[in-house]
Amino acid sequence: MVGRLSLQDVPELVDAKKKGDGVLDSPDSGLPPSPSPSHWGLAAGGGGGERAAAPGTLEPDAAAATPAAPSPASLPLAPGCALRLCPLSFGEGVEFDPLPPKEVRYTSLVKYDSERHFIDDVQLPLGLAVASCSQTVTCVPNGTWRNYKAEVRFEPRHRPTRFLSTTIVYPKYPKAVYTTTLDYNCRKTLRRFLSSVELEAAELPGSDDLSDEC
C-alpha cells in the first residue's frame, strides 16, 4: 500500500526524488518502490534540528541498553521450510514550514473486507473549513499491495508541519486497517519526508510455494 498526501501550493519535498532507490524495490518483494530507511535516517540526523522520536520507538540510549531480539532469519529452520519477508507495517512523515497557530487533524480509516469500504473523519478547530477532500483506494486482485491516494485542501490553507501514516498488514488475514493522521507541531521548523517499511520473517512450507499469501 502506498500513502501520499497532496496539498496545493506546497513546495517539492527535499530530496524526495533522490530517495527512490531502496532495498525493497525488487519486483519480487511485492511492494511498490519506497525510500530505504537508511536514507531517511541519515537525512533526519543531518537536518540541523532535533526530531521527536516516533511513537513506539526507543531513544538511542535506551535502544543501546536494550538487548536485541534474535532475528527470525538467524533461527534454525525445519527441513522443507523457507523464510519470506512479509509487510508488517508501513509509516511515513512529512514536516513543513511555516507553522500554524492551532492544530489541524485529518484522520482517514480504510478497511478492506468482502465489501470494500473506507471511513473518513476530519477534525478541525473553529474558524477552519475543508475546501475539498478526495480519496481513492485501488485494490489489486491477487496482489500483495494496494494503492492509496488522498488529497485534502484546507481553508485557510495552512501548510502541515507533520504528516504521519501507518499501515498494518495482518498475515494470512484478508483485512487491513489504514490510519492516517495530519497534525501540527509548533516546535518543529524543518521540512522532511520520512518513509519506512517494517518487515518480519514468515516461515512457508517449501520454497516452491511462495504465493502471495501475506
UniProtKB/Swiss-Prot annotation:
Coiled coil located at which positions?
none
| Residues that bear Phosphoserine | S6, S26
- Cellular compartments per GO CC: actin filament bundle; cytoplasm
Q: One MF term in GO for this entry? A: filamin binding
Q: Which UniProt keywords apply?
A: Cytoplasm, Cytoskeleton, Phosphoprotein
Ranges for the region named Disordered are 1-56
Q: Do you know which InterPro entries this protein is assigned to?
A: Refilin (IPR028215)
Q: Specify whether Cytoplasm is a keyword of the entry.
A: yes
Tell me the Gene Ontology biological-process terms attached to this UniProt entry.
actin filament bundle organization; epithelial to mesenchymal transition; negative regulation of bone mineralization involved in bone maturation; negative regulation of chondrocyte development; skeletal system morphogenesis
| Cell compartment(s), UniProt | Cytoplasm, Cytoskeleton
Predominant cellular place of this UniProt entry's protein: cytoplasm
- Record's family? Belongs to the Refilin family.
Q: What does this protein's UniProt record list under function?
A: Involved in the regulation of the perinuclear actin network and nuclear shape through interaction with filamins. Plays an essential role in the formation of cartilaginous skeletal elements.
Q: How does it assemble?
A: Interacts with FLNA and FLNB.
Instruction: Write down what this protein is called.
Output: Refilin-B
